[in-house]
Amino acid sequence: MNALAPDLVRTLHASCDACFGTTAVWPLVEHAYGEPQRHYHTLAHLAELFAHLAPYRAEPLWPVIELAVWAHDFVYATTLPDHADNEARSAQWVVQVTNAHCSASWLRAHASYVSVAHDLVLATKSHRLPDAFASAPDLQRAGRIFLDADLAILAAAPDRLREYDRAIACEWAQDPDAPSAAFREGRKQALEHLRAQAPLFQSAEFAPLTPLAQRNLDTLIAEYA
């Protein structure tokens, strides 16, 4: 699911321009999510994520969710040790890009949204929200919906799940049919970490995906054992 139909690219382009209030950000997004090492974390991933989130566009904090989506995989290194900083660098990007390219009036209206989006992008490292969100129900709801949508791929149908897992292997320069022992162990640990999370999906809206996602994780873990 790496290639994206032209009409979907145009839709993403228009949505990006509207979100940031400028045409300057889209070329940066298109370039980053089109990097050659990417096979899953591409524009197609953004389109899929926005599709999962479509029912929540009327949420009070939709602008926060939208900013977090654009930023959350902006930096996606797949080499050691750079990959450890992906989330932190992506979070910093949303602050830097808005300061550099958005208008003063946009920044005044969206300053708090950018700050929260920064924190949500950081949260994708553990897929758990900062403790401070617990005292703000609207923030907590927005954060849970965003993080859950990012994990919704785990509840995909078998063919899509297989496509996703093979794409992750390709991103790490692996032959998906014969990955290295080191990759197999690292991938298994990452999947086991997700499987151990309780709850896996934190929002009531995505919670029904849990049984299928857990079965899928069990299947993938067994294949890497």
Task: List each model region and its residues.
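Divalent metal-dependent phosphate-bond-processing catalytic cores, especially two-metal-ion Mg2+/Mn2+ enzymes
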Residues: 2-7, 11-15, 34-41, 51-62, ...
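Short alpha-helical hairpin
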Residues: 13-32, 45
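Alpha-helix N-cap and coil->helix boundary residues
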Residues: 24, 60-64, 85, 112-116
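Short amphipathic alpha-helical interaction patches enriched in hydrophobic/aromatic residues
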Residues: 33, 37, 73-79, 98, ...
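Aromatic- and histidine-enriched alpha-helix N-cap/loop-to-helix transition segments
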Residues: 41-44, 85
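An active-site-proximal "capping" alpha-helix that borders the catalytic cofactor pocket
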Residues: 49, 85-100
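His-Asp-centered metal-binding catalytic motifs of divalent-metal-dependent phosphohydrolases/nucleases
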Residues: 49, 62-79, 90, 117-125
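Charged mid-protein connector segments
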Residues: 93, 97-149
